[in-house]
Amino acid sequence: MLLDLNRFSFSVFLKEIRLLTALALPMLLAQVAQVGIGFVDTVMAGGAGKEDLAAVALGSSAFATVYITFMGIMAALNPMIAQLYGAGKTDEVGETGRQGIWFGLFLGIFGMVLMWAAITPFRNWLTLSDYVEGTMAQYMLFTSLAMPAAMVHRALHAYASSLNRPRLIMLVSFAAFVLNVPLNYIFVYGKFGMPALGGAGCGLATMAVFWFSALALWIYIAKEKFFRPFGLTAKFGKPDWAVFKQIWKIGAPIGLSYFLEASAFSFIVFLLAPFGEDYVAAQQVGISLSGILYMIPQSVGSAGTVRIGFSLGRREFSRARYISGVSLVSGWMLAVITVLSLVLFRSPLASMYNDDPAVLSIAATVLLFAGLFQPTDFTQCIASYALRGYKVTKVPMFIHAAAFWGCGLLPGYLLAYRFDMGIYGFWTALIASLTIAAIALVWCLELCSREMVRSHKVV
């Protein structure tokens, strides 16, 4: 049977569900808060005007592409730390965490420079009104300054979650979400003596929130008694290029996979610019709501990575394979809820972002497409996270490349422009690409986990 789901008793299945839930639920709530920050940005920008919403849509697409790609690279820390923790290598856990912080800081600085360099080419490439162009540039400048803090935060996030302490992440994320609301209000609309920055104010709020999150999570870990034996904050460690090389080897394919998936969504925003601001704004609604729901498989997948990595560290290879299957089944059950939510409530959901009739009409149809790809999106996400627990990252990268670009973005462009399907052509192709990715990744996980069990002669 697929992933040996019939290997253990139903009581073991329920136990694994409980363990996954204990990890995934705080991660989910943390994701709710983090994605909610983007939701607040979109709503606040929409309240300032259609042009501000379009500017934030373009600027956030650029920021999200860099952030998500680099976040994927930092995700290498999860299986590394989880496997060390499972093997009982306490000192190595702390040292790997320190090196992760160094690596995140350097990566974040590079991301900041990269975003600075991208501002002028974007302004020259896109045909936009002066207001949208200027607001987009300001937004990108502000969010670029968030990159170093964002990557340090991801290192600390991986450290805490891999040691089965996601509650700290949840608390910091909710504090950041609460802080983001008044900051957006002040910067976007010009309150308490601040100038009204419009959509650019969302970028300034994002910068402040990321720096707060990194500092708060560091303080939590330093003060929490559970973390003291690992010694993350007990001493200063110099950058270790050997560890950096290991992080890069595992993380670079993950980052590229993230980029390929994120760019398939984000790049569509730029390709839709010639259709007009209504389509760009509607696309942002679709991306925002899809992102909010995507946090569910991400949370289940992250929990699966930790549980699989921990089991492999303990050399429980058959258990790791079983956990992979339980993670997928959990995702399939949850996908039913998200499908129904998007299909049944697509019009009210779209109206939360903007009240322009043209935008609402397009966005409601876009959300119907988003609902249709939920099951396959959940599947490909959780399967790729499970493979990450095995430190298998290159094959998923190639699968994502073929699926999202070869079967998604390029056919979507043809459907949109050659067959006059417009925005719906892109979403049709995305459904096909996610389906292909899901099938390929599940099959890869089946083969990888089975071979791991066989090679270690686990009965």
Regions found by a protein language model. Give the residues of each.
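Short alpha-helical transmembrane segments in multi-pass integral membrane proteins
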Residues: 1-24, 81-148, 194-252, 308-373, ...
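Transmembrane helical elements of multi-pass membrane transporters/channels
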Residues: 22-41, 142, 146, 176, ...
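Small-residue-rich hydrophobic transmembrane alpha-helices
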Residues: 53-113, 150-164, 168-169, 283-346, ...
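Interfacial/gating helices of multi-pass transporter permease domains
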Residues: 22, 45-64, 131-135, 199-200, ...
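Generic alpha-helical transmembrane segments of integral inner-membrane proteins
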Residues: 28, 32, 36, 40, ...
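Short runs within selected transmembrane alpha-helices of multi-pass transporters and secretion channels
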Residues: 74, 78, 143-161, 169-180, ...
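N-terminal alpha-helical transmembrane segments of multi-pass membrane transport
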Residues: 2-5, 16-18, 22-35, 47-53
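Helix-terminus/linker motif at the lipid-water interface of multi-pass membrane proteins
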Residues: 32, 36-54, 123-130, 186-197, ...
